[in-house]
Amino acid sequence: MALLSAMKGKLISVIGDEDTCVGFLLGGVGEINKNRHPNFMVVDKNTAVSEIEDCFKRFIKRDDIDIILINQNYAELIRHVIDSHTAPTPAVLEIPSKDHPYDASKDSILRRAKGMFNPEDMIANRG
C-alpha cells in the first residue's frame, strides 16, 4: 500500500505561519495540483478562522494529500473540525511554530492514538 501511495505521488500539505510554510516549501513540499490549488496555506494575523477551517476541509477531501501538517495554535482554533476527521488518511499532525511550542496535552490526535494502545498489553506481549 505504501508503494502504491508513493507511485501515485501523494502530497504533504501544510497549514501554518509564514516561517513554517516557507521552511517546508524550501524543503520541496510545495505543489499546485492540476486545478491550480496549492497544498499549503500561510496563516497570518488577518486570516479568519473560517478560512483555516475551509482550507482544512479542502485538504481532507483531496485524494492527492496523505498528510496534513498544521501548526498546533491554528489546530486549536479549528479543533472541532479536526476532531471530526476520523479517516486514516490524510493523517493530521500538529506541529509547533516558532512562537508557539508543541504541547502534547492539547493534541487530540495524539490522545486518540494513546487510547488505542494499553501500555500494559505492550509489556505483557514482550515476554
UniProtKB/Swiss-Prot annotation:
One term of GO molecular function: proton-transporting ATPase activity, rotational mechanism
UniProt entry keywords in alphabetical sequence: Hydrogen ion transport, Ion transport, Transport
Database matches in InterPro entries: ATPase_V1-cplx_f_g_su, ATPase_V1-cplx_fsu_euk, ATPase_V1_fsu_sf
Highest taxon, organism lineage: Eukaryota
Keyword Coiled coil: no
Pfam families documented for this protein: ATP-synt_F
Gene Ontology CC annotation, any one: proton-transporting V-type ATPase, V1 domain
Job of this protein: Subunit of the V1 complex of vacuolar(H+)-ATPase (V-ATPase), a multisubunit enzyme composed of a peripheral complex (V1) that hydrolyzes ATP and a membrane integral complex (V0) that translocates protons. V-ATPase is responsible for acidifying and maintaining the pH of intracellular compartments and in some cell types, is targeted to the plasma membrane, where it is responsible for acidifying the extracellular environment.
Subunit organization: V-ATPase is a heteromultimeric enzyme made up of two complexes: the ATP-hydrolytic V1 complex and the proton translocation V0 complex. The V1 complex consists of three catalytic AB heterodimers that form a heterohexamer, three peripheral stalks each consisting of EG heterodimers, one central rotor including subunits D and F, and the regulatory subunits C and H. The proton translocation complex V0 consists of the proton transport subunit a, a ring of proteolipid subunits c9c'', rotary subunit d, subunits e and f, and the accessory subunits VhaAC45 and ATP6AP2.
Family membership noted in the UniProt record: Belongs to the V-ATPase F subunit family.
Annotated protein name in UniProt: V-type proton ATPase subunit F
Organism: Anopheles gambiae (African malaria mosquito)
